[in-house]
């Protein structure tokens, strides 16, 4: 099945009636075959989708609005193509529902069927101050200035380059594993369907006997700038590369991508489910 499918190849018709058939699944195996690593180690975590343009009608025909968060397990065989999700949510705009809970149940059923796994759906009232959708800050230090003192120009690369992680480093190891927590706001890749740029913030927490070189890590993150890959695939590529180079005892990799079409996507992969953080939202979302 082509990742383009019927999306992006012709003028889009926006449905005005409930249309679950617009949801378009994409096999995770497509991206994982490219990574060429152990699939089972990429299946621990979640993809959190946050939708800010959800609306439906109550029984009086009055528009209702809410913010939604969808939790798709990394073990699901499929992801959902983001534009198809937007079309699906739009199709609910003029459908009557008796309660918010009914909408929540319906969306969970349709998304679960699409990705062939149980999807957790939360709907938040706009007046709920404790929704977990307030602006947060990544943990750790920001490494975006790690190359500020370097005179070397960072070249553009067509594909991610994990060899940058070991550039000009020694084989010295730390006697006891140390935890490094850091983030960068400079993650960029391209959507493989539309070729549009996807910007995001990447955060990593890693416990390893190998020290993290912030400058090399930044070079590695910048090597994604012209890479064509879905959000989930990019995070899994980073998780696989860091796992193979650092051989960590614990690893968490997550990204918060900026919103498009009212939806942002936030994948997270962990070496153990106990390391899974809570979903959150950053300032660019």
Curated annotation (Swiss-Prot):
Enzyme class: oxidoreductase
EC number in record: 1.7.1.13
Chemical reaction(s) catalysed: 7-aminomethyl-7-carbaguanine + 2 NADP(+) = 7-cyano-7-deazaguanine + 2 NADPH + 3 H(+)
Keyword Cytoplasm: yes
Entry GO terms, CC: cytoplasm
Cystine crosslinks: none
Cell location: Cytoplasm
SUPFAM superfamilies: Tetrahydrobiopterin biosynthesis enzymes-like
HAMAP family in alphabetical order: QueF_type2 (MF_00817)
Protein name per UniProt: NADPH-dependent 7-cyano-7-deazaguanine reductase
Organism: Psychrobacter cryohalolentis (strain ATCC BAA-1226 / DSM 17306 / VKM B-2378 / K5)
């Amino acid at each position: 099945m082509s990742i383009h499918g019927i999306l992006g190849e012709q003028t889009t018709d926006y449905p005005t009636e409930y249309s679950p058939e617009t949801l378009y699944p994409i096999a995770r195996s497509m991206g994982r075959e490219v990574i060429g690593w152990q699939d089972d180690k990429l299946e621990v975590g979640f993809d959190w989708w946050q939708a800010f343009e959800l609306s439906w009608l109550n029984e009086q025909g009055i528009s209702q609005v809410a913010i939604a968060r969808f939790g798709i397990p990394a073990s699901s065989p499929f992801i959902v193509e983001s534009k198809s999700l937007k079309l699906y949510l739009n199709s609910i705009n003029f459908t009557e529902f008796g309660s918010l809970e009914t909408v929540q149940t319906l969306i969970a059923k349709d998304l679960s069927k699409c990705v062939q796994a149980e999807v957790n759906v939360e709907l938040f009232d706009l007046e709920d101050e404790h929704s977990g959708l307030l602006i947060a800050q990544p943990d750790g230090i920001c490494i975006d200035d790690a190359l500020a003192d370097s005179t070397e120009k960072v070249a553009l690369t067509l594909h991610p380059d994990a060899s940058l992680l070991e550039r000009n480093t020694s084989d010295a190891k730390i006697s006891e594993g140390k935890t490094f927590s850091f983030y960068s706001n400079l993650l960029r890749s391209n959507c493989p369907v539309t070729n549009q740029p996807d910007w995001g913030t990447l955060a990593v927490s890693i416990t390893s006997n190998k020290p993290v070189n912030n400058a090399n890590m930044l070079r590695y993150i910048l090597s994604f700038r012209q890479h064509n890959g879905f959000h989930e695939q990019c995070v899994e590529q980073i998780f696989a590369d860091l796992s193979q180079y650092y051989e960590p005892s614990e690893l968490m990799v997550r990204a918060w991508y900026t919103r498009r079409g009212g939806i942002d996507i936030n994948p997270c992969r962990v070496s153990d489910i106990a390391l899974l953080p809570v979903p959150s939202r950053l300032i660019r979302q």
